[in-house]
Structure formats: structure tokens, C-alpha cells
Amino acid sequence: VKPAVTSLSNPAPKTGLYVGNSFTYYNCGLVGYVRGFAKAAGIPWRARQITISSGRLSYHPMAQYLAPHELDPYAKGKVKDGKLTAPMFDVVFIQALSTEPIDAKSIPTWKKYLKSEVAEVKAAGSEPVVVVTWAKKDHPEDTKKLADSIISAANENGAAALPVGLAFAEAHAGRPDINFYAPDKRHPSAAG
């Protein structure tokens, strides 16, 4: 499945929100790695990470994450009369529980919440990016299933899809000497 949205309307986002679970926070969190890469490249980047262990999309109150709070530094200078005048985040990365998009029992609920969360992100003026997760180490055949399911759902909702899982599989295949997985065979190692 090919992504329908292949670029962001803001080609140089400066703020982001990562919404996910342990795939997002494992090994000190994705937010720290991306911040380091951005800093090394001289790219301005600030981000917040909100994760729930074993969290499904339905566990995340997205509208609350994007609502202004008087002490929130991401809302500073963007609130008038209790309402946002500009988005708190340029981009919001939405990452589901890794098996939700391919588990027959989970798919309907996952699609329902992905649709509502993408709509809430857009309503807040941010751009939604749906994260394509990677397969478990002992189930590499799930890589394509995950990518197809997630990209299809992102397309249906007018959201970009970030092919992390496809890149993870390609890197793992290209460097079999590096262990990309933690001992549990699902979370990433520091190299992953």
C-alpha cells in the first residue's frame, strides 16, 4: 500500500508531540534520540512524549493532550480567552499498540480511535502522522501486514504515515550483525 499523504504542509516543523506506548519510550524514549539528531543537524526541535505502557489508541485522550493549560510551555503566547490561537504542536505522531492494526479483534476499535484522534489533531491545527510500527523479531512476516494496515488507515483519514517499521526491517536485514531488538523480541534495543 502506498501512502496518499507524502509530505507535510509545514515542511519544517519545530514542535512535536509523540503519543504512544513502550515502543515510543523504550531506551530513554524516542524524543531524546530525535532531539539529539536535530541538535546535531542544527535543526530547531522541541517535543513532548506522552506514553502509556501497553497503551492502545483508545487509552489516549488526544483532545486533552492538545488543549491549552495556563502553565503549559507549548501553549505560551498561543492562548486568548482560554482558547488556542495557534497550534501547540506542529506535528503529532500517533503510535498504536503494535498488534492493534493486525489483530482481528482489535482492528475495529483501533480504526475508530485512529479516525477520532486524527480528527482531533487536525481540529487543533496540528498535522497528524501515523507511525508504522515494526514486527516482533520472531514474526518478520508481520512487517508488510502492519505497514499495509497502518498506511491504509492513515490514507483513509488523510494523515501521513511514517514508515518506521519498514525502515526498521530494512536496517535489520542490511545489518544482521546488529541486534535491533531487546531480549523480549518486540521492543527496540538502543541500536534499534
Regions found by a protein language model. Name each.
Residues 10-12, 180, 192:
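Conserved catalytic region of serine esterases and O-acyltransferases that act on ester linkages
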Residues 19-20, 131:
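Short hydrophobic segments within beta-strands
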Residues 15, 24-109:
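Conserved SGNH/GDSL esterase-like catalytic core that processes O-acyl groups on lipids
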Residues 1-15:
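N-terminal low-complexity, Pro/Thr/Ser-rich intrinsically disordered segments
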Residues 77-190:
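Alpha-helical cap/lid subdomain in secreted, periplasmic
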Residues 14-17, 127-128:
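Short, surface-exposed connector motifs at secondary-structure boundaries
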Residues 11, 40-42, 123, 156:
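Short, well-ordered coil/turn elements that cap or connect secondary structure elements
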